[in-house]
Every structure is written in C-alpha cells, then in structure tokens.
C-alpha cells in the first residue's frame, strides 16, 4: 500500500503463501483470521528446508482506501501486500489463472507450487508437515 514494489522472487528460499483476496469478498474476509493464525504460528518456525514463512497478499481491489482499511481491520500484519487496483484484470490474477477468490498457492523454497486453496486448519496442518 505504501507504493513500494514487492517481488515474489525476493522471498525465494522461504515457504510463501500467495493469498488472492479483496476487501469486498466476504469469504476472503471470513478466511483472514485463519491466515493470520497460521502467520502467527509459523512466521518464526524452523522448516526442514526453507528459511522461514511469509505471506504475499494480492488484492483484487479497485479502491485503495477500502483495501488499506481491510488490511488494518483484519490485522494482516505481514509486510507483503500488493495490488494494481485493477480488479479482475489484475496481472497477478491472470498469471496464476485466478478466477475466484479466496485463492491461495503455497510455494516451496524453490518457487514451486506445492498446494492450492488451503483453508482453515488445512493450511496449518500442511505447514506443520514442512517444519522440523
């Protein structure tokens, strides 16, 4: 939201959850507490191969104020929040073939997608298997 460029490649070597969402998406907002819980639990965890865990949130919002307000209201405290404010025409959504949200992709330390659309306790249990 601060206007800085964020790149997924900066997180190589870590487990990354790419989370496509939007402030106007009720199912996304209902899932956010589970994402926050997983972040809190695994942000400092030791992983078998990876050097940590990060979340890369990609918003499909059009309105920056609504997007920023939702980040604050849902307590999405990680650093990596991006949006081109292009709604469904988002370049990232096109690249990942996202046509419904919430949509998540779990990426390993090599940059390979290892799981998709993890929700609720499934996200935590999947991350648990990757820890030492």
Task: Map each language-model feature to its residues.
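Conserved helix-turn-beta segment immediately C-terminal to the redox Cys motif
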Residues: 15, 32-58, 131
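Conserved redox-active cysteine motifs that mediate thiol-disulfide chemistry
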Residues: 20-37
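A short beta-strand-turn-helix
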Residues: 1-16, 41
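Conserved Rossmann-like nucleotide-binding pocket used by diverse enzymes
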Residues: 7, 16-21, 56, 82
């Amino acid at each position: 939201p601060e206007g800085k460029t964020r790149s997924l490649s900066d997180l190589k070597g870590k487990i990354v959850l790419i989370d496509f969402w939007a402030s106007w998406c009720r199912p996304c907002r209902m899932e956010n507490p589970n994402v926050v819980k997983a972040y809190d639990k695994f942000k400092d965890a030791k992983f078998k191969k990876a050097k940590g865990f990060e979340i890369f949130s990609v918003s499909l919002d059009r309105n920056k104020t609504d997007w920023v307000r939702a980040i604050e209201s849902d307590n999405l405290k990680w650093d990596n929040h991006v949006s081109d404010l292009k709604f469904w025409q988002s370049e990232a959504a096109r690249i990942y073939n996202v046509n419904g949200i919430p949509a998540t992709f779990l990426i390993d330390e090599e940059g390979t997608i290892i799981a998709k659309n993890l929700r609720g306790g499934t996200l935590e249990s999947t991350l648990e298997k990757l820890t030492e």
